[in-house]
């Protein structure tokens, strides 16, 4: 049976107000159509027509929390792939409790977070201040716990870091693309969440989605490397950010294949 890649999937995003414009832009640059809706009177209609859903809890407020839960449940009911980005889940009890409720009742297809965020979800102690993670090494014991967490919940977990780790509990991959400068730009993790939602929405076949997720993680890292290589003397982080989004809009499969640093476990 021929498997067709969906063109220009519609991505519904309920996200934080810090990075909302950047998420819309990376979605367009990676081949998707962004739509941000939170009003309860249109949520059901919007979510049902979407090819993918992203929920980002970076700036929580009561109305948005209700919107997130409504949309996650609809996505679950309709079989629409969904991504949860539990930004700063380790920072407060509210975030932690709400993220766990979303996971339990909304059953996301994928959870993306930095190591501190993912360790919090699996019940480990994290090294962080506020929403920022200072955990930089992923032990084999923690890897195994993450695999078990993914397997038990039938979802994909993406752990972003110096080396990104992706697992669905059965398959696992490590991605070594990227640059330190990406960690100095507000929202690069949130932007990755948008790319991962797109990766899930390109195909209806679940067996193709894991490799698309790995490709999206690697692609984002490669764009960071290329953006840094374009920097000239006295060009700083804002030029780097511009280059990063620019590279995402022009990168092709040939460049990805040449530069990807992916190891499957």
Swiss-Prot record:
Transmembrane segments: none annotated. InterPro entries: Hyethyz_kinase (IPR000417), Ribokinase-like (IPR029056). It catalyses: 5-(2-hydroxyethyl)-4-methylthiazole + ATP = 4-methyl-5-(2-phosphooxyethyl)-thiazole + ADP + H(+). Pfam families: HK. Catalyzes the phosphorylation of the hydroxyl group of 4-methyl-5-beta-hydroxyethylthiazole (THZ). This is Hydroxyethylthiazole kinase. Pathway: Cofactor biosynthesis; thiamine diphosphate biosynthesis; 4-methyl-5-(2-phosphoethyl)-thiazole from 5-(2-hydroxyethyl)-4-methylthiazole: step 1/1. Coiled coil: none annotated. ATP binds at residues 112, 160. Gene3D superfamilies: 3.40.1190.20. NCBIfam families: PRK09355.1. It is an enzyme of class 2 (transferase). GO terms for biological process: thiamine biosynthetic process; thiamine diphosphate biosynthetic process. Substrate binds at residues 36, 187. The gene is thiM. Its EC number is 2.7.1.50. The keyword Cell cycle does not apply. Belongs to the Thz kinase family.
């Amino acid at each position: 049976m021929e498997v067709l890649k969906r063109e220009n999937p519609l991505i519904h995003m309920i996200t934080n107000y810090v990075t909302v414009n950047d998420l819309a832009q990376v979605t367009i640059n990676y081949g998707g159509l962004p739509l941000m809706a939170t009003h309860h009177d249109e949520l059901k209609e919007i979510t049902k027509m979407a090819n993918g859903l992203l929920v980002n809890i970076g700036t929580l407020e009561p109305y948005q929390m209700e919107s997130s839960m409504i949309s996650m449940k609809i996505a679950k009911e309709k079989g629409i792939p969904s991504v949860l980005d539990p930004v700063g889940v380790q920072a407060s009890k509210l975030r932690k409790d709400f993220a766990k409720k979303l996971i339990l009742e909304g059953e996301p297809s994928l959870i993306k977070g930095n190591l501190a965020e993912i360790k919090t979800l699996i019940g480990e102690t994290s090294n962080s201040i506020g929403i920022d993670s200072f955990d930089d090494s992923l032990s084999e014991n923690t890897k195994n716990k993450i695999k078990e967490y993914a397997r038990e919940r039938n979802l994909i977990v993406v752990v972003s870091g110096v080396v990104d780790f992706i697992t669905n509990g059965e398959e696992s991959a490590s991605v070594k693309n990227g640059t330190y400068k990406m960690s100095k730009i507000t929202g690069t993790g949130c932007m990755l969440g948008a790319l991962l939602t797109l990766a899930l929405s390109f195909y209806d076949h679940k067996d193709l989605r894991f490799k698309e997720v790995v490709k999206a993680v690697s692609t984002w890292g490669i764009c960071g490397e290329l953006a840094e290589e374009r920097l000239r003397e006295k060009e700083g982080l804002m030029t780097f950010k511009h280059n990063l989004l620019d590279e995402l809009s022009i990168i092709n499969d040939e460049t990805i294949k040449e530069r990807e640093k992916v190891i499957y476990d």
